[in-house]
A protein has these predicted regions:
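A conserved structural/catalytic subdomain of Rossmann-like adenosyl-cofactor enzymes
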Residues: 3-179
């Protein structure tokens, strides 16, 4: 059951920042398949992977005009075979604006690579039909057995996103028809 409702509808937000639980194995897929809140508009994710259930809930919670989100996910949401159709539909609706690949070991007790997916319900005209992919896996410092992003790394990522253009070996703007 959604935590934020406006009467009988999902509450809508201008900005959603999320770090949902990764790849939940046990979840109520059957209930989501028949979701009365309209959160299954891309389809129903496979039983062992609830990531796209969270993704659809977040997108459904974004305000139609001003809604934006940034979601931290395991890198696997970008390429796992069993979620191909969900990804395809997500790309087709053209709300994904940016995908930032992050290096391993950035999170306590998690060695896996992660990504940040930024979506906008109203993309700038120059971004429509496009997604920028930023490979920030090399933008990680390590000290005292901890991995982290330094301010210079963060600024490089922000600059690449704001400029929305190719940067050799770091950022690539892709047409959604090529994804």
């Amino acid at each position: 059951h959604p935590a934020f409702l406006d009467g009988s509808h999902l509450r809508k937000f201008d900005i959603v920042l999320a770090n949902p639980p990764y790849s939940i194995k046990e979840w109520n897929r059957e209930k989501f398949m028949n979701d009365k809140w309209g959160r299954n508009f891309l389809g129903t994710p496979p039983q062992g992977r609830a990531d796209y259930a969270f993704f659809q809930h977040i997108i459904a919670s974004m305000d139609r005009n001003t809604g934006r989100c940034a979601i931290l996910f395991p890198h696997g949401v970008l390429f796992r075979d069993e979620e191909y159709e969900l990804r395809k539909k997500l790309v087709e609706i053209d709300i994904v604006d940016c995908v930032i690949g992050l290096g391993p070991n950035l999170f306590f007790n998690a060695s896996m690579e992660a990504c940040i997916i930024i979506c906008k319900n109203r993309k700038e005209d120059s971004h429509k039909g496009k997604v920028i992919f930023i490979d920030a896996k090399g933008e990680v410092s390590r000290k005292n057995a901890e991995s982290y992003l330094e301010n210079t790394h963060i600024q490089k990522i922000i600059s690449a996103y704001e400029n929305f253009e190719d940067i050799e070996y770091f950022a690539k703007v892709a047409d959604i028809n090529d994804i």
